[in-house]
UniProtKB/Swiss-Prot annotation:
Predominant location category: cytoplasm
Protein name: PF03932 family protein CutC
Coiled-coil ranges per UniProt: none
Gene Ontology CC: one annotated term: cytoplasm
Gene Ontology terms, MF aspect: copper ion binding
Subcellular location, record wording: Cytoplasm
Assigned protein family: Belongs to the CutC family.
Amino acid sequence: MTKLEVCCYSVDCAQIAEKAGADRVELCCGQSEGGVTPSVGALMQARETVTIPVHPIVRPRGGDFCYSSNDFTIMKNDIARIRDLGFAGVVVGVLDTDGHIDMPRMREIMSVSGSLAVTFHRAFDMCQNPMIALKQLAELNVARILTSGQQQNAELGLALLKDLVAATKDQGPIIMAGAGVRLTNMQKFIDAGIRELHSSAGRTVPSTMRYRKAGVTMCADSDVDEFSHYCVDGEVVEAMKSLLVMGSPLAKHT
């Protein structure tokens, strides 16, 4: 059966995702930057309170995936901490200046990761040649690749996603579709034979604050609504999981 990974930007969201039936959580912070490394406190709380597999992202900043020596050292330190805390896996990716997989650095990351299941994240979608990148990641023995098929969303990238699935049919990383995967379009990914789906399955939640100071913001973008935040919608996760169960070959014959 196709698995559902839910992208969570807080431990609260991870707990909601688990309760709603998610198979796995990708734990991040910094939604506006596309996900960056969660704090040590968040990692510890997730480890203590979430029982399904949690894969924290290790990404020291937003933007591109070509990192300074300090950034890279920080990444290795974060991965070591995640490994030592006993997480099931980690989500990471590093490119070189020409848009290829940075193989020397990725080999170091794989070594530091130890028994962690490594997901190579959507840095894959920024690679020059996806099929060469796939071969390199297979050589590294990463567990899976999170990708939109090198498009702005995974539905637009279905053609490449199908090619990647075909190329890894017998061996290689699991291809996990992500970016714009929703209840309304997920059947397309199931029909394409994609084994894992990644979704934020969320909604905007208003702040509980009654007093709201006017004219002062913490964000550089003063148009951002700071009295709301994005959170996983448990009902959406439940509905997505139900569709996956009904869409599985076993369910169709029972």
